[in-house]
Amino acid sequence: EYSRIFPEILVDHSQKKLSEEKRELSARWSASVIITTSVRFFESLFADKPTDCRKLHNIANSVILFDEAQSLPSDLATATIQAVNTLCEKYRCTMVFSTATQPDYQAIEGARWHPTEIISDSKSLFEKTKRVQIEWRLNINDLHIYRSDFCAIASEMARESNICAVVNLRRHARELFHALANLVRDSGALFLLTTDLCPAHRLEVVREIKRRQRLHEPCIVVATQCIEAGVDLDFDVLYRALAPLEAIIQAAGRCNRNRRQTFGKVVVFEPLDERRAYPGDSYERAAMIVK
């Protein structure tokens, strides 16, 4: 997509095979437009190998856009923001953080984070673009989220024709998928999308889901967080296992995405699991704050 707009563009990430000429250019980022990953970018700033640091002079005086900025690791937030500030103050860079769920970096002590909003009244914009209604499965008496087993969730999902469930663990995704497989007659309508699949296979699955949605064919998807950002799919109903608020919002972005109805439906539930139900301690702490 970018190459149709910019005449000179260099794509540099671990899964991209480069020609000898492009490999030499990528070592120094000698191009007017660079498409890379946040990992590769920060490696160029923090690496202890000279080969990784040869890009710094070309980073200076640049406009740097971080898409889906909320995905930057929270445990490295202090170092990340300090590096960003240094590039702005010492190297005359301009940073743009693009996301629907902007982290509160100002809360980090000593972060020196003073961004300028590009949109003057972002709250009003969010109100105008509201597309979903969120159902929090709460017990009004004690404000605890009902803990749902996957068989019950599968039974509800099987009654829908265009629905997705996003869970926190691959183990949960497999369990829900197998529960649905016993209920859904059309096996071609059922999809599992996790990082157990290689990137090429995930892309193939996404393309098939898009094809079925375009033809208004039944589509029931079980996925992990790999579907939350940058995946252009549109579901009428979306179930989201309890997670940090930004993850719930990102998942909700896959519901009623194209405004085919007034409001889509997002259901937040807590899985019934006696074992560890979250991918990491910081993720679990953030989910408990939401709860």
Describe the residue ranges of each PLM region:
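A short beta-strand element within the Helicase C-terminal
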Residues: 222-250, 264-269
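Post-DEXD/H (motif II) to motif III coupling segment of the RecA-like Helicase ATP-binding lobe
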Residues: 52-63, 70-125
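Conserved two-lobed SF2 helicase motor
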Residues: 28-48, 212-228, 240
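Conserved strand-helix element at the start of the C-terminal RecA-like helicase core
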Residues: 1, 156-181
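Conserved segment of the helicase C-terminal RecA-like domain
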Residues: 217, 250, 254-290
